Amino acid sequence: MKMNDYKTRLLSEYKELVDRISKLRVFLNKWDNGQLSFVPKPSRAIYSKQLEAMCTYKMCLESRMLTDKISFKEVENV
């Protein structure tokens, strides 16, 4: 695999993860403020655990980016 392919995939994955974390946080804030139009079946604790896992994974990707000297600014170009 070429480094460029690896880098592109890593940046895409990171960008998508950041977007999903943001959307989950918005969802949880709406839930906490009673602004949802439905009642989620899974417990709030499960969603909190999911957010925690996603943030941990984001830190792993950031570590890989730093190790491979991939600039966070490059995420904007993906």
Protein language model regions, located:
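Extended, charge-rich alpha-helical interface modules
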Residues: 1-78
